[in-house]
Amino acid sequence: MAMLGNVLHLSPMVLATTTTTKPSLLNQSKCTKATPSSLKNCKTIDELKMFHRSLTKQGLDNDVSTITKLVARSCELGTRESLSFAKEVFENSESYGTCFMYNSLIRGYASSGLCNEAILLFLRMMNSGISPDKYTFPFGLSACAKSRAKGNGIQIHGLIVKMGYAKDLFVQNSLVHFYAECGELDSARKVFDEMSERNVVSWTSMICGYARRDFAKDAVDLFFRMVRDEEVTPNSVTMVCVISACAKLEDLETGEKVYAFIRNSGIEVNDLMVSALVDMYMKCNAIDVAKRLFDEYGASNLDLCNAMASNYVRQGLTREALGVFNLMMDSGVRPDRISMLSAISSCSQLRNILWGKSCHGYVLRNGFESWDNICNALIDMYMKCHRQDTAFRIFDRMSNKTVVTWNSIVAGYVENGEVDAAWETFETMPEKNIVSWNTIISGLVQGSLFEEAIEVFCSMQSQEGVNADGVTMMSIASACGHLGALDLAKWIYYYIEKNGIQLDVRLGTTLVDMFSRCGDPESAMSIFNSLTNRDVSAWTAAIGAMAMAGNAERAIELFDDMIEQGLKPDGVAFVGALTACSHGGLVQQGKEIFYSMLKLHGVSPEDVHYGCMVDLLGRAGLLEEAVQLIEDMPMEPNDVIWNSLLAACRVQGNVEMAAYAAEKIQVLAPERTGSYVLLSNVYASAGRWNDMAKVRLSMKEKGLRKPPGTSSIQIRGKTHEFTSGDESHPEMPNIEAMLDEVSQRASHLGHVPDLSNVLMDVDEKEKIFMLSRHSEKLAMAYGLISSNKGTTIRIVKNLRVCSDCHSFAKFASKVYNREIILRDNNRFHYIRQGKCSCGDFW
């Protein structure tokens, strides 16, 4: 406003002077007479045109030397108008067009980004019979590099060899740059290695080529060879590229060495280098160092602010990112579209609609709404803030709806749990890329539509140009793990290996979890052991795999190994270790781990950790100690804590304490069906049928229903699901016959049905029949009649397996010499020759 005020208060005399100013006569005279010396003084296209008119009047428009210089000077200006004028002059004098004239035009068009025109001029020169020189080829290759015209560049390389310029340093540097920019790094390296002489441009082109692709390690290695072995002094471009390579590698140690080299070598640090250093430190999680650099060089640099803000967003430090944005505004730095992307993304992650609207207002006021990526970010923000109507208004106004735009809509629906709407949008997309497929597959998995996710993945295989990546396979592996389908799990692992998908720590961790959930702990641990870079999540997955397999001792060994390797366990890792102790009955070790959380590792126990301890103590029969732990909690115990106690009371048969725990649950979570079911189980086991009936009546009055028990089994790639009491399976007569056979043979070996699992006051015969229709027994019988002798039977149940079915499975495994692997909602049961891995402790 101050500047505007100064303009408004100019005196009339000043206004008159400023509005009547005419072009300087001195400038006019410098370009009026057409001489080579006056051409140098022409600074604008109008002056060049004036010079050309003067040249024509003087009859010098046929002077090759002067016309060539006019074309060159016009190209140097680099505007579309000056290039068109240069080409017009060139066209009128083409009969005596020179190599220098062509070089000027090719270079001018390439430098201005008009690369296709530059390439056409190069080809036109070749066809005109004018021989190129050592400058022509680099200018042509520059155009090919910028436009990624790989075919044209390769043809130019052929001409270079044919015409004897292959050993020229300037030409060789251009070839290295061209191949590197086009991603042909092997070809670039071949030219580089064959060079008899290399300068800083040669090394920088190769290093930057590696750094911009997925060969950051090669970029770093080549840099140190350059400065140590060859003693070539790098320039600022070299330094920016090698610093960015360290950032990609997240290699703080090497990044520090590069920064030390900069300080010791006396290389002048410019803004781009500082931005690259900040980016590197942020990506290496050295946030404090990045912040010191940022503060040292000030907040007045736009690129530096953008580097800081975008990395804050990437780290999830969204409030800090917005702080940088506010600092820019206070410092008078005008945010650009990159700044706005970080700001909008921060609002999106925070789900802060007020700040998001403020960013949207800034976008509209500053004309950024024409940028597709800005609109895509706004759509994402509004969808995450549950403002779908606003998101769709932006979507409808966009004239250029890219695949990224559509992906934002699909992702927004997935984020809001609207899987059907996401699917409908996905189906109508005019174009789909791998992100589209990954988004919808992930949405289906999040919606527990696991089989549908796998079907979509199979459909994706027929799409030309769409190849699964690590993100795809993580979703599919997760779906497979939830289904417990081991054959599918093995195929997924084979698919990853066959298609060369990189097994990084995230995908590897997902595969460990997948095989663990599918009852194959050996494969899970094999993948874990193959990972070269294991983070806390990978170790936690391995600990969980051993815990689910009933190998509590090995799970604790892994937990200790992780700590010995210098990794700090997080809350999730402690859950895995405590769960292992609970499943294995390791009370003392569980206590030691629990009390070490805050004391040794600085991790405050949360509800879930107390729940694990209550479960551990309760299973061991230490109910009074479990209650004391609950009473000593620093926070109010939630319904999950009390449910752990209730489950323990059922195992121990403590009716009074079970009723107390159930009462607490019904206050905290009155809709929780499981607590009513558990309490009714306790009453039924104690023969207190009236109390059980009251619980059931209370459930009915509140509209609560026990979820039906379902068990699934895969036979020859097809999933068969059974529900307790359901007799609709087409093989039901054969299943019933097998159940009768197993029951008789198990009875001869001493199996007695556990009638306490029937929660109805009916006669003994009816109870036995009801037990025979439990879903896991139906699945087990179908497995026995449908699979080959000696093969493993794998069953997945949605609820906890009852004691009668557990006992029944042990007898069946012994009678038929089968391994039965039963996964319930709590753990795995590996049953062999009448014995279970859980030791009847579950």
UniProtKB/Swiss-Prot annotation:
One of its GO terms (biological process) is RNA modification. GO terms for molecular function: RNA binding; zinc ion binding. PROSITE patterns: PPR (PS51375). PPR repeats lie at residues 98-132, 133-167, 168-202, 203-234, 235-269, 270-300, 301-335, 336-370, 371-401, 402-436, 437-463, 469-503, 504-534, 535-569, 570-605, 606-636. The keyword Repeat applies. Keywords: Repeat. Residues 748-842 are annotated as: Type DYW motif. SUPFAM superfamilies: TPR-like. Belongs to the PPR family. PCMP-H subfamily. This is Pentatricopeptide repeat-containing protein At3g22690.
